[in-house]
Amino acid sequence: MRRSAAALAALSLLATAAVLDGTEAPAEAAPLDGASVVPLQVTGDPSERFNLVLLGDGYTEEEMPLFREQVDQHLNVQWSIEPFRSYRNYFNVYLVETPSAESGVDCDPAHGWERRDTALGMGFFNGCDESALERLLTVDSSAANAAADMVPGVSANNRQILALANSETYGGAGGRLATASSGNALSALISPHELAHSLGALQDEYPYYFRDTSLGRYTGAEPASAHHTLMSSERMLDEEAKWWRWLGEESESGGTIGAADPDGHEGGLYHSEDVWRPSNHSMLKTLGYYFDQVGREVMTHRISGLRDRATLPVSSTPEGEVGAEDAVWVEGPHPVHHELDYTWTVDGEELTDASGARGLELAGLDLEAGARISVRVQDPTEFVRDPDIRASAAMTRTLTWTVGESLEPVEAEAGFTRHRDTERAVSATEVVYAETTRPTDRIMEVAWELDGSTVSTSTDGRTLDLGEFDLPAGDHVLSATVTDPEGSGSQTLTWTVDATAPSAPRELSEAAATVAGGEHHLYLNEFSMRLSPEDDGEGHVVGEFRVDGDGWHHYYGWPEDSEAPFRFTPDGTNVDDLVYGSLGSGGLSMAVFEVDSHEPGWGTHTVEHRAIDSAGNIGSPESFTATVVPGAELECTETVSGAVNGGLRVDEGVVCLDGADVRGKVTVTGGASLVVEGGSLRGGLSASGAHTVRLSGTQVSGAVSISGTTSEVTLLGSSLSGALALNDNTQVPADTWSGEASGYGPVLAGNTVRGSVACSGNNPAVTDFGAANDVTGSVAGQCSDL
């Protein structure tokens, strides 16, 4: 569904920036004095590649290093996402530097209604329109296109422009001239989402139009969109329609791929009902997730065929007649982690010895005039399951020659033409390529060495698959040398192979307690996580995390602050009418009106996190377990710490023990509250008729008896040596509770009990929120299952 920029001016740009056409800002842009083109990645002729052109506005000459750093971040985020990661070599990337006279852009909410003298005239509020949405960040389209036109060989038909504004305020717009604020936490995620539209022709999966308002029920016919449907799984399978080949698969972006079924994923095309998407969340619905397999297949097809051209870019000896003594060659593009298939035939009979070769010397084949030589170039990627897509010209090309008149002789010295660039480190699983010069009567030879040893993984030596070697951690030296079998010339290329995996060390908020013997933390109401992705190489390192296996999600800090940790709560946090950090059944992020239809995420979760470095290495995930339980904020009327001799009696108020060492029995009487954090109770605990009893990470020696409590009993991650009895306690849900109205019982989670446990008469029954207790004695009553 496409609408004009005016119609969409009030749309959420945190999630819908890519819907908007690149609108022309009313502001006058400055002349492009001092502009320069910086090629960042050139893997082929612009006519044979998809070209990404990055612009910057509001950066002074002195701020150009900042611009380059932010561009590095944007690109490395994009290259971490499939299929961009695997098809990176199908892209050329150019930076056009356009220094501005002043720093910043027009009408940035962080700086008031100020105008700035900039090269591209970028501005918030649709170019300082008071009636527009502040996040609608626009650019002077004439100036932006003029800047992009500076890139030789690149035209509007084979490029995507992304204009970055020097601002930390979130904003953006979309189309083939997309915009984003460069310093915001989420801005690096706009470019991949926008390419899904402009390159992949994919549609939005949002169930809303305005962030807090859906268009409601979808009433149209079966959508033309490749990733929206009205079909049930049964019908989709029967008709072999849409994404039937992916049904039931675990989604790369979380959950299970489904259709219009009771357990399907309802919502999309700005409607919340009666239209279904394949997965619970993908980047088409929520910034931060990957494409699911359905969207990834479409994107792979479109990237391979260079968008609307729909043709795999293959270079070759010109089709037609060739001599029986000639050599013919063909060269397709180079995926990063696999190779294209090259299948040669003569008069329909396959030449199995030549399988995978990009060149064929005819002299040894004893061919008669009129013989037909063909080669089929095909991408075997597992990202594509539809045989029609694989057989299309975008992924399969067949070239044919007939033996007849010889080619006009062409001599060439041994040398490399196109190759994997040597400036950037190679990943440990990459397929490195090196194309050579091509005389008409012979094929150059290429030899590879890895750390001084001769290696080979391909028929013709034009590629080396490093994934075959299971390289140990550290840097390695890879070289390729081309020689002429009939001459003395040669050339050598050398790469550094980075086989050191990156990591993403975590910093968690302080837990109420930690379960003994592992990375299992217990939290009241919420927790936060800061990742600090790191690597021994250069370039921006991407961090990712996922919760309960539900799809890897980009780590960006927090939507409002890239330096802040990511915050997890059972229902998420509303940030500008979108919800973030939800542990509930709907995933990490959703529209505000979706929260009520999902189960809140109280209880136990597994969080994994990892990093991806600029070379493309993916680090092994680390993980921890977090249990989130409800708990009221209690204001201490008295705080006790240090050593307490002779025991302790609590008769009124809220007495808090902060790391205290109580030597003697603790007694809590009617209406009083006891909150213990850490420390030790060396004499047991007896509470009768108390208001609240809460122990977190506490060591208790002696029996514990808690009965008749009127509001809360919570024992978290504590070590008890002695019998435990919980009887006739009433648990009143904390004001943070968002689960079922029936509430929850006394909380006994993640404790170690060296003694018997007996529970009876508690209302509701005792619960552990998924954090099992380690009990060595007998267990009876309501605690039997804990």
Model-derived segments and their meaning:
Residues P318-V330, E382-A447, S453, L466-A632:
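Low-complexity, disordered linker/stalk regions enriched in Pro/Thr/Ser/Gly
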Residues P630-L786:
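Extended beta-solenoid/beta-helix repeat architectures
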